Amino acid sequence: AHHSQNRLVHRQQHKAEMRVAQEQIEFYRDLKSKMSTKMVGETLEEHCSTTFEMQLRPHMPYAKFGKDNKTVDGTKGDFIFSNSDGETEYISIMFEMKNESEETEKKHKNVDFLKKLDEDRKKKECEYAVLVSTLEADSDLYNTGIVDVSHLYEKMYIIRPQFFVPLITL
C-alpha cells in the first residue's frame, strides 16, 4: 500500500510541475504575440543601429546611419546609410527592415516588399536598396548570405540581419 501511495504522490507532483510549465509556455506565447509586429520591427532596427555604432562607426568617421524621418511624396524608408570622404558622398543605401511575426496569418515573401523599396530608394535618391529581413526563415537562399536581386530591381539586395556589417563593408 505504501508503494502505490508513493507513486500517487509522484504522479500528482508531476502533474503540478507540468501545469506550471504549461502556464509558463502560455505566458511567453502571450507575451510574444503582444510584442506586435512593429515592436519586432523596432528590435530589428535597433539591432542594425547598435551593430553600426559598435562595429562600423570607428572605421567610418563620416558615415551616417539613421532612421529616415523625412517623408518625400508620401514615402519614408526605414533607414538610410551614407558615407563620404568628408566632403563628397560616395555611397547611399536605403534600408527596409522586415520581420516575421509568428502571429501573422499571411506569410509575406521578401519579394512582396521590393517594389516599394525601389520606389523609396528612387524618391530618396539613394544608390542602393537593401531589404533586411527575417521573412522566409527556412529559405536556404536567404540564409546563406547576401542575395543580389538586381535582376528584378537595380542595385538591390536582400540580407539577414547578421549580414548587415558584411554588406556595408563590401
Annotate each PLM feature.
Residues 34-39, 45-170:
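Amphipathic, heptad-repeat alpha-helical coiled-coil/stalk segments that mediate oligomerization
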Residues 1-34:
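Residues forming the hydrophobic interface stripe of long heptad-repeat coiled-coil alpha-helices
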